[in-house]
Curated annotation (Swiss-Prot):
ATP binds at residues 34, 38, 80, 85, 93, 99-101, 120-125, 172, 371. The gene is HSP90-2. GO terms for cellular component: cytoplasm. Keywords: ATP-binding, Chaperone, Cytoplasm, Immunity, Innate immunity, Nucleotide-binding, Phosphoprotein, Plant defense, Stress response. InterPro entries: HATPase_C_sf (IPR036890), Heat_shock_protein_90_CS (IPR019805), HSP90_C (IPR037196), Hsp90_fam (IPR001404), Hsp90_N (IPR020575), Ribosomal_Su5_D2-typ_SF (IPR020568). This is Heat shock protein 90-2. It comes from Arabidopsis thaliana (Mouse-ear cress).
Length: 699
């Protein structure tokens, strides 16, 4: 053999290997599923390449997976005639470059996840070390020579050019040197059971090298023939007599042969009524590398001008990289007339349905279709439209069971909201699937449909409030009047709600109205209208004083009928960002700051004329417009309103200082420290006693 090159495992991979080797896992059997799955992927790749270039299969025309148990040497060998690996592939993929999932998988394990999740994180190969203490990989790619990779997982591995003369033609051979306590994986029955359990629906023949013992009946003279020939004796006996006396004897003859294990035809070609739950679960697990069963399944065929069959699965959990934009979606496998074409076709299903797993087998697409021509293909557009329709049907079926739908919604509500934002064609349909907490729903979630059925007489709009969390919005000043009138308000506390609601303007003819934006119209009696006009007139002077103090911090100051208990609140323009949206946009590292200029709309301060603080402030302002304490109190009220209305403070230190000085006044503490006069925050008057009584008013 040529000289071996030694490489160190990348740190994270080394950590993962030591975790796999040194931790006890009860379900080590999943290693076989992972290795067969890798072989299947390698076969998919070469088959796809061969569609446009037949010569790619010259090295080995047959596509297969072979499993060879060797009880003499305690090894288990898995051979596939897939695409193989070049030397660079061997070095990179099996050791020196950590996949994005390596770290996540270790974190998941530490959090108590099952080792059988390994395939979902793209590191399934290393599961071989669950049962083996040494692994040797021999591989041949069409573009390179044959190489051997070897490691006992002790921090390093070697790669050598294979000069043994035993050529693969093309593909990969993995030899697992099994640990002493893992020899059960050499038993024919155990291996067959595992293939049937995990890999029954792999679309390539999986054959097991089995030992067959046949009992053969032979006569004594057949057995002794050779002996007689050697001795050279010839006896002449009566033929009839010889036949009678001839004794029969049984001997065991041992032979080896390939036994095809996965004999099932593709599950999607069978009728749904013929397939039981267990078969769907087994197919889902082999398709997705998930260790859990699916939450729901949709098996259907479309016939007519266009023909295709499909099976779609909804998982129980969201994958760790659900919204990883760098990762290409590969959850829908595309087949053409039972031939696998690709599993990362971005156009087959919209991004918001990226969590749905499954297969599509088309009768109409050309076999040699490429990713480029696929994008313009009209057939694919029709398939996509049908898949979206069937996915939504499936979600409505899940919604019939409240418990299942709660699980589904917890995992995939963001996807539905992304669908509202992106899919204008199905927006109203998806809106029916949305669920929210509300002022009347308690711990339960409510649908928009249910909200509409509970609307008060004369109520024409659906009211909602956006914010950081349910806790942050449930006592918001914006809800005071609505609650008093018994009007239900939906809590939209997911960041993506802001984007979704920007697109979903109405539901069943009812306009969606934000409780935090100006222009909130509620039904009023004649008496209420009259009283409002009187208060407006009474507080006109204070509104002007507040506007003068705050300057361009607010666009206008008006008397509010929105707040009942709080002294004031800050509302945004009808078409600008809400406070919550402003918070979200500020948090985005790559935000477009020019956009913030015109989207973060001017704030309107709405004051509550029936609040005692505001009434006292009005009296002081009317008595003396230049009262310095009025300015300080207005600034303090503005800053607290910023917080209670969901905005962030631009100058938290100034706010802190203002509060501390108010506390000192309230506690009658003299502030001897020289304080510089601040135009924004003038010092309070020296009369501590008088201010103390004022402070009681503020409290």
């Amino acid at each position: 053999m040529a000289d071996a090159e030694t490489f160190a495992f990348q740190a994270e991979i080394n950590q993962l290997l030591s975790l796999i080797i040194n931790t006890f896992y009860s379900n080590k059997e999943i290693f076989l599923r992972e290795l067969i799955s890798n072989s299947s992927d390698a076969l998919d790749k070469i088959r796809f390449e061969s569609l446009t270039d037949k010569s790619k299969l010259d090295g080995q025309p047959e596509l297969f997976i072979h499993i060879i148990p060797d009880k003499t040497n305690n090894t288990l060998t898995i051979i596939d005639s897939g695409i193989g690996m070049t030397k660079a592939d061997l070095v990179n993929n099996l050791g020196t470059i950590a996949r994005s999932g390596t770290k996540e998988f270790m974190e998941a394990l530490a959090a108590g996840a099952d080792v059988s999740m390994i395939g979902q994180f793209g590191v399934g190969f290393y599961s071989a070390y669950l049962v083996a203490d040494k692994v040797v990989v021999t591989t041949k790619h069409n573009d390179d020579e044959q190489y051997v990779w070897e490691s006992q997982a002790g921090g390093s591995f070697t790669v050598t050019r294979d000069t043994s003369g035993e050529t693969l033609g093309r593909g990969t051979k993995m030899v697992l040197y099994l640990k002493e306590d893992q020899l059960e994986y050499l038993e024919e029955r155990r291996l067959k059971d595992l293939v049937k359990k995990h890999s029954e629906f792999i679309s390539y023949p999986i054959s097991l090298w089995i030992e067959k013992t046949i009992e053969k009946e032979i006569s004594d003279d057949e057995e002794e023939e050779e002996k007689k020939d050697e001795e050279g004796k010839v006896e002449e006996v009566d033929e009839e007599k010889e036949k009678e006396e001839k004794k029969k004897k049984k001997i065991k003859e041992v032979s080896h042969e390939w036994d095809l294990v996965n004999k099932q035809k593709p599950i999607w070609m069978r009728k749904p009524e013929e397939i039981n739950k267990e078969e769907y679960a087994a197919f889902y697990k082999s398709l997705s590398n998930d260790w859990e069963e699916h939450l729901a399944v949709k098996h259907f065929s479309v016939e007519g001008q266009l023909e295709f069959k499909a099976i779609l699965f909804v998982p129980k959990r969201a994958p760790f990289d659900l919204f990883d934009t760098k990762k290409k979606p590969n959850n829908i496998k595309l087949y053409v007339r039972r031939v696998f074409i690709m599993d990362n076709c971005e156009d087959i299903i919209p991004e918001y349905l990226g969590f749905v797993k499954g297969i599509v087998d088309s009768e109409d697409l050309p076999l040699n279709i490429s990713r480029e021509t696929l994008q313009q293909n009209k057939i694919l557009k029709v398939i996509r439209k049908n898949l979206v329709k069937k996915c939504l049907e499936l979600f409505f079926e899940i919604a019939e069971n409240k418990e299942d739908y709660n699980k589904f919604y917890e995992a995939f509500s963001k996807n539905l909201k992304l669908g509202i934002h992106e899919d204008s064609q199905n927006r109203t349909k998806i809106a029916e699937l949305l669920r929210y907490h509300s002022t009347k729903s308690g711990d339960e979630l409510t649908s928009l449909k249910d909200y509409v059925t509970r609307m008060k007489e004369g109520q024409n709009d659906i009211f909602y409030i956006t914010g950081e969390s349910k806790k942050a919005v449930e006592n918001s000043p914006f809800l005071e009047k609505l609650k008093k009138k018994g009007i239900e308000v939906l809590y939209m506390v997911d960041a993506i709600d802001e984007y979704a609601i920007g697109q979903l303007k109405e539901f069943e003819g009812k306009k969606l109205v934000s409780a935090t934006k100006e222009g909130l119209k509620l039904d009023e009696t004649e008496d209420e209208k009259k009283k409002k006009e009187e208060l407006k007139e009474k507080f006109e002077g204070l509104c002007k004083v507040i506007k003068d103090v705050l300057g361009d911090k607010v666009e206008k100051v008006i008397v509010s009928d929105r707040v009942v208990d709080s002294p004031c609140c800050l509302v945004t323009g009808e078409y600008g960002w809400t406070a919550n949206m402003e918070r979200i946009m500020k948090a985005q590292a790559l935000r477009d700051s020019s956009m913030a200029g015109y989207m973060s709309s001017k704030k309107t301060m709405e004051i509550n004329p029936e609040n005692s603080i505001m009434d006292e402030l009005r009296k002081r302002a009317d008595a003396d417009k230049n009262d310095k304490s009025v300015k300080d109190l207005v600034l303090l009220l503005f800053e607290t309103a910023l917080l209670t209305s969901g905005f962030s403070l631009d100058e938290p230190n100034t706010f802190g200082s203002r509060i501390h000085r108010m506390l000192k006044l309230g506690l009658s503490i003299d502030d001897d420290d020289a304080v510089e006069a601040d135009a924004e925050m003038p010092p309070l008057e020296d009369d501590a006693d008088a201010e103390g009584s004022k402070m009681e008013e503020v409290d």
